[in-house]
């Protein structure tokens, strides 16, 4: 058995009048991500971490933003696809550790639902998904409330 680690990152600008979806959950907020799909930064970074750990490219390779069929797509579909590819390559998800960076809204109260949504899309127990939230202390686009970002590390074991 071998262990592999992947890292993922995503950032989206925020605009008024768009839905804010993070970790598969729609959050009450007046801004949401500008993106080709639903703009779920956590799901996108997680997808990249999983694909990278397995040596399977990145989210843009599998779901190019130039393809109209992914316009407005639910990012949970991306995670389900990544899980299918991991299964085909005989990889099991051991652990996911994520940080979402945003000034608002506060994410902590929504973590249980996010963990359930992510675990469900990946077919793993919620104990394998760990989430944290940080602010940028008012610094840069994230700190000014103009963007949201996520960093994710995923650990896989070969079966």
Residues covered by each model-derived region:
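Short acidic capping loops at alpha-helix termini that bridge into adjacent secondary structure
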Residues: 125-128
